From Swiss-Prot:
Family label: Belongs to the OXA1/ALB3/YidC family. Type 1 subfamily.
Protein's recorded name: Membrane protein insertase YidC
HAMAP family assigned: YidC_type1 (MF_01810)
Record NCBIfam families: PRK01318.1-3, yidC_nterm, yidC_oxa1_cterm
Described purpose of this protein according to its UniProt entry: Required for the insertion and/or proper folding and/or complex formation of integral membrane proteins into the membrane. Involved in integration of membrane proteins that insert both dependently and independently of the Sec translocase complex, as well as at least some lipoproteins. Aids folding of multispanning membrane proteins.
Coiled coil: none
Molecular function GO labels: membrane insertase activity
Compositionally skewed regions (Low complexity) per UniProt: 40-52
A cellular component annotation (GO) from this entry: plasma membrane
Superkingdom classification of source: Bacteria
Recorded topology in the membrane: Multi-pass membrane protein
Species classification: Bacteria, Pseudomonadati, Pseudomonadota, Gammaproteobacteria, Pseudomonadales
Gene: yidC
Length: 567
């Protein structure tokens, strides 16, 4: 019996340890409380900083750095100083996006995700990219280098022209293309093209260079993510645990390398990569750049004042007079949806970080998603998943409950042994083991199902915590977000009550101290579960109800079989 309780308590300790400590060590990054200094305006901040992206050595042997002006700069000889701000930004609307593109530089400075609310009680769409006086998060791209309009030593940015100030994906259309045009003083026509598709968070960015001048044109394509150091606005802490906030670089040699704000502040990345990607991650969402397949790129990080800049630069593209060329890359600005990310680039789906038990979490997620497709409710899908898991462990649980039922049946004999050999623990232990052997009882049998199901429990926690599909997912009545704690603590209380009923079916430990501890377990678990996601508490509650039914049936059966047996 002592061994059984030790294993049980050890198992419970493992649950606490793995669910809190592992997340804190591997995934939780302390979120800085210091937001980047407020800018008096996006225009004024743009003129005060330089963003230095080092060109690849093969076309910049001298190591010269070309300043790339940040989005928002109005310093351009081509710009109209009286241009209204309303005319400066181009609005692009699809079924999933509302984007704002700055004509100065042609960069995406704002993105609203139309299918995701800012918060549970808000009807405003979630903003991922933004450029305000207090927040900066941008998707930039440009042409730098010798002749690149974004790489002039004067720090000027090209001012693009567009056919209209508003583009919208029309009904019946599946694709939308936005062409921004700029002509250099030497006569080189540059078209910056954005291509978007229906039901897609993929943004294809390309430059078409038409060299109408008399000299060869040379420039380097670059893509960047620019972000301040503000905390994650979409983070939904659970048990004080927050999702990873920071940068990730993927290369064939190192498919998933993290750089948090501290790393980005202390060291500068500068490495040549082919077939890789870089991204900035926050809870449920990410922004990523994926260079073209088999295209060599120089991945870099740097600072722009208080802002972090992470990006890449292609080797130089040379366009002879009278010739044309096209160069570009793919961006992703949106939710962490495994299937979409998996199709976009190798290892990009790993940004949905299910932890070291991913080999359990991933199948659980796909099964849960399949159930949701059948019933259309994530809460009901969790219940069906619980039934399935219970069915998988049915025989193991039955063996455990039979062992506990037999322990309950021989409880009077155990009490008698304690009375006879209470002062001789060694003799008492020998007699107890002899009794277990005679009655074919496994003293560890009652703990085994709990230990075996722990990985499932922990994996489901990560599924609920990381899956954007469960963000703001309602169940019924007062449960409107399964990824967050029950606001009224009703589910944890019901779970505690079910655990109390289940404990009453177990044999009473002969040790009074153990008996008191076991009586307190439902209360301890209830308090522990108060801050768990409602979906996880729902899983545990349904599992308890199914376990009670199975255990009650087996206990009654064993008691009937041993009713006339004397010890």
């Amino acid at each position: 019996m002592d061994i059984q309780r030790i294993v049980l308590f050890a198992g419970l300790a493992i649950v606490s340890y793995l669910m809190v400590l592992a997340w804190n060590e591997d995934y939780h990054q302390p979120q800085t409380e210091q937001v980047a200094e407020a800018q008096s305006s996006s225009d004024s901040s743009a003129t005060n900083s330089t963003d230095d992206m080092i060109l690849p050595e093969d076309n910049n042997a001298g190591g010269e750095e070309f300043a790339t002006p940040e989005t928002g700069s109005l310093a351009s000889t081509s710009a109209n100083s009286d241009q209204d701000l309303a005319d400066r930004f181009i609005t692009v609307t699809t079924d999933v996006y509302e984007l704002k593109i700055d004509r100065v530089g042609g960069n995406v400075v704002d993105s609203s995700l139309l299918q995701y609310d800012e918060s549970l009680d808000s009807e405003q769409p979630l903003k991922l990219l933004t450029n305000t006086s207090t927040r900066t998060y941008l998707l930039e791209s440009g042409l730098i280098g010798r002749d690149g309009p974004d790489g002039s030593q004067a720090g000027e940015a090209p001012v693009f022209q567009a056919e209209t100030g508003s583009y919208q994906l029309a009904e019946g259309e599946d694709e939308l293309t936005i062409n921004l045009v700029y002509t250099t003083d030497s006569g080189v026509a540059i078209t910056k093209r954005y291509h978007l598709a229906r039901n897609s968070y993929q943004i294809d960015v390309s430059y078409l260079i038409d060299n109408r001048s008399e000299s060869p044109w040379q420039g380097n394509f670059t893509g960047k993510i620019v972000r301040d150091q503000a905390p994650d606005p979409t983070s939904q802490a659970s048990m004080g645990i927050r999702a990873y906030l920071g940068m990730v670089i993927s290369t064939p040699e190192d498919p998933y390398e993290k750089y948090d704000f501290e790393d980005l502040s202390e060291k500068r990345v500068n490495q040549s990569v082919t077939n890789g990607w870089l991204a900035f991650l926050q809870h449920y969402f990410l922004t990523a750049w994926i260079p073209e397949r088999d295209q060599k790129a120089q991945f870099q990080t740097t600072r722009r004042g208080d802002l972090h800049v992470m990006g890449f630069v292609y080797p130089a593209t040379t366009v002879a007079p009278g010739e044309t060329a096209e160069v570009g890359a793919t961006a992703y600005v949106g939710p962490k949806i495994i299937d979409r990310l998996e199709a976009l680039a190798p290892n990009l789906d790993r940004t949905v970080d299910f932890g070291w038990l991913f080999f359990i979490s991933l199948p659980l997620f796909y099964i849960l998603e399949w159930f949701y497709g059948l019933v259309g409710n994530w809460g009901v899908a969790i219940i069906l998943l619980t039934v399935l898991v219970k069915a998988v462990f049915f025989h193991l649980s039955a063996t455990s409950y039979r062992s506990m039922a037999k322990m309950r049946a021989v409880a009077p004999q155990l009490t008698r042994l304690k009375e006879l050999y209470g002062d001789d623990r060694q003799r008492m232990s020998q007699e107890m083991m002899a009794l277990y052997k005679r009655e074919k009882i496994n003293p560890l049998g009652g703990c085994l199902p709990i230990l075996v199901q722990m990985p499932v429990f922990i994996s489901l926690y990560w599924v609920l915590f990381e899956s954007v599909q469960l963000r703001h997912a309602p169940f019924m009545l007062w449960i409107q977000d399964l990824s967050q704690m029950d606001p009224y603590f009703i589910l944890p209380i019901l779970m505690g009550a079910s655990m109390f009923i289940q404990m009453s079916l177990n044999p009473t430990p002969p040790d009074p101290m153990q008996a008191k501890i076991m009586k307190l377990m439902p209360l301890i678990f209830t308090v522990f579960f108060l801050w768990f996601p409602a979906g996880l508490v729902l899983y545990w509650l349904v599992n308890n109800i199914l376990s009670i039914s199975q255990q009650w049936y087996i206990t009654r059966k064993i008691e009937a079989e041993t009713a006339g047996k004397k010890y």
